[in-house]
Every structure is written in structure tokens, then in C-alpha cells.
Amino acid sequence: MVEQGDAAPLLRWAEGPAVSLPQAPQPQAGGWGRGGGGGARPAAEPPRRREPEEPAAPEVLLQPGRLELGDVEEDQVVAVFVVTFDPRSGNMVEWCLPQDIDLEGVEFKSMASGSHKIQSDFIYFRKGPFFGLACFANMPVESELERGARMKSVGILSPSYTLLYRYMHFLENQVRHQLEMPGHYSHLAAFYEDKKGVLHAGPGRGSSLPPVYWLPSIHRYMYPEMKITHPAGCMSQFIKFFGEQILILWKFALLRKRILIFSPPPVGVVCYRVYCCCCLANVSLPGIGGTIPESKPFFYVNVADIESLEVEVSYVACTTEKIFEEKRELYDVYVDNQNVKTHHDHLQPLLKINSADREKYRRLNEQRQMLLYSQEVEEDYNPCEEDLFVLFFLEQNNRIFQTLLEVSASQDKTLTAEHARGMGLDPQGDRSFLLDLLEAYGIDVMLVIDNPCCP
């Protein structure tokens, strides 16, 4: 039985250079709003001291096999917004900049269903070509109009999710400020002016942006850097929560299946599971992945996303809405707590843990223990556990595809049980997985591993 891992506290983010806000130049903040009027006064908290920014390592998002170190990701914010829950109207966008940005659906993405039961949360989500991060807070108030509770989210949109963590602390402070002083947006307006990105002009500006590539490349450029503090990293919690079942998720992620993770609020830690699931499928060999759809981290989704999910052939997402379980046409794999299941008959064999899976899990834990030992005894924190986790699966995936490419280039194109063992797979237990893998990636080899004989 896999150990329940949600007792651990929410992950703490390691802050990079402090977000520096210019002084609000005028008392009346710009932006569009429907509620909480009145001139903006300075925020309750004092302005944060501007600290010198240290040169950061380049963080890039690349297609597999395309490592271009000059492509440094820009630190851009394309929108900032405040969402509130109105007892009469429901979720609504209270204020935003820029005024003409399309935020349809963001009022539901940034305030997860069921959030009224918790005090605070953070949510990653996807909105068209952009990624969003919102911080939610729930404050009791003595107001019959608000039915005893005031709930708001403050969030931002960016072309990529890898830099959103930098603003977590700022958003947490601002949502508390909005709860205590509704309608005062001067710090948010100043923040947007300081960080705003330039959108492409034209009616279809969102769709004209280049596609977002999340698949990493090699070593330090190999995965989106989320800088989670040691030792409460998302990878270690992911392994602790799912145990050996991460090998089941690994196979489904490598096959680019539609993976939907259900969990009641808070949803922040579940967004980390989406990220970790995506990290299982990295491949850095050239020529791999050209015929298979891009695997997309959608992070949090709700019923408002059903129409967009209907046309997706591959994604990883999470939700707090149980209704999704009934909509089987939207997903291939459904994860409820630690229960991984699929309604597709041909995928059922992939749900079984085999001897090769157990061996991989043993090696992963062995490497983790060696890393922890070196960190504690030798005080060597490079690489970190996140590096180890991603490298482990990257090397496993590269070994599989390197073998498959070599066999496909051979004269007889025959893939044997010996090849399977050399790839770290179980010839019998992973036969179905191998067949699906060959079909998904369009690799021309002949599998000569027979089905196990019936007794």
C-alpha cells in the first residue's frame, strides 16, 4: 500500500531576487474594474527594498533535440488581474491590466471549485497560449452582503510557466491586501508597468505567438527550473505520494496519453504533480517525437475547459471537479488520489507493476539515498534531487529510443527479448507497452516477443 503523502506541508518556494515595485506614481490606478470603486491608497505593507539582481542562469523551453542556448526565456507578464467571488453573481474578474486582454474563463481557472472550504491556495493554469499563476485567499468578514466570507484571487499571465514562481510571494501579499483593502490596485498597476510584455498586434494576437515548448533538453537546461526549496521538493513528494506507481505514470506520459489528476482542494500541490508527470517523458535524442503530439501541461482545468479538452490528443492536467470522471471521452488515464486507472481495454496491461518496474524504482531510491548522503555528509548540493529525478528518466527514455532506432536501422529490424531487457523493460510484462510505443512513435521494427503461454 502506497503511503499517504498529503500530510506534508505545501511546498515552499525558494525566492529568487525580490520583486521590486516602483512607487505608485498616482493615487488612482488604471485598469478596468466592475467592483470596489474609490481611489487607491498606498498598500498596507511598506514598499519592498530594491535589491541588486544577480545574473540568472538561462532558462529555456525547447523541442526535443533542439538545444539553442541563445534562446533565453524573457521574463514577461502579459496580464495581471483580480478575481472575486460575488455571492449574487459568482466568480467574476474585478480588475485587470491591460484592459483589452481576453480573460474569459480566468475567473474560474484562478479560483478552483471547492476553494470556499480552504483559507488559501495557489493555482497554475493555462489560458490559450499563456500560462497563469494565481494566489487565492479566503477571509471571514462580518458582512451579511458577503455572507460572512470574502474570497479573492490575484494572478498573472505569462508566455511560459517556468518563471511564474518568481512572483508567488508578491501575489500572496497582494491577495491579502485586496481582501483587507478592496479596490486598491496601485501596486498591481505599477507591477504590470514594470513587467509587462509586448503582445503581437492584430485580432489573433494570442494565436500568433510561437508555440510553447515545455520539453527540456540536457542537464541544467533539461527541465523547467521551479526552484523549490530543499528538502520539500516536488519530486520527492511526488515519489513519496505515488511510490512504484510513478512507473505506471511514466509509461502513460511517454505514450502521450491524456492524463487527468483529480484531487479536492488545495490544488497547488496537485499542480506540482502535473509538472512532475511531464518530467517523466523527456527525450533528448534527435529524431524522436516528430510524429507524436506535443504533451501539454494544462495544470488546473474545470468544466469551462471541456470544449478545449475535447480536441486535445495529449495533455496532463488536474481538477477538483468530480464530474470529469464521468466524461471518459476527455481522458485516457484518470488518477484519483493514488488510484491510477484507465477505461481503455488495450491500456489495462500497463496498470500492472512488473519486475523491471520494481527494479527501476529500487535504483531510483538508491540514487536518491546516495544523493541525500552526499548532501548531509559532504554538504554537496549540486546536483539537487530534482536534477537526479529528471536525469534518471531522461537516461531511461534515451536508452529505450536509442535501442529502438538502432534496431530499426538494422537489416532484419527484429526486436527481441534481449533487447527489451537491455532497455530496462520486462520482455513479457512490457510487451503491450512496447507495441504501443512503436505505434505511437512510428518506429519500424518487428517485435518477436511472444505472449506468455496460458497454463
From Swiss-Prot:
The modification Omega-N-methylarginine is found at residue 41. InterPro entries: DENND11/AVL9_GEFs, LCHN/Anr2, Tripartite_DENN. It comes from the Eukaryota. Residues 1-61 are annotated as: Disordered. PANTHER family: DENN DOMAIN-CONTAINING PROTEIN 11, LATE SECRETORY PATHWAY PROTEIN AVL9-RELATED. GO terms for cellular component: cytoplasm. Disulfide bonds: none annotated. It comes from Homo sapiens. The keyword Acetylation applies. Probable guanine nucleotide exchange factor (GEF). May promote the exchange of GDP to GTP, converting inactive GDP-bound small GTPases into their active GTP-bound form. May play a role in neuritogenesis, as well as in neuronal recovery and/or restructuring in the hippocampus following transient cerebral ischemia. The gene is DENND11. Residues 214-362 form the cDENN domain. Residues 18-187 form the uDENN domain. Residues 30-40 have a biased composition (Gly residues). Belongs to the DENND11 family. Residues 364-455 form the dDENN domain. It holds the Pfam family DENND11. One of its GO terms (molecular function) is guanyl-nucleotide exchange factor activity. The keyword Acetylation applies. Keywords: Acetylation, Guanine-nucleotide releasing factor, Methylation. The modification N-acetylvaline is found at residue 2. Transmembrane segments: none annotated. This is DENN domain-containing protein 11.
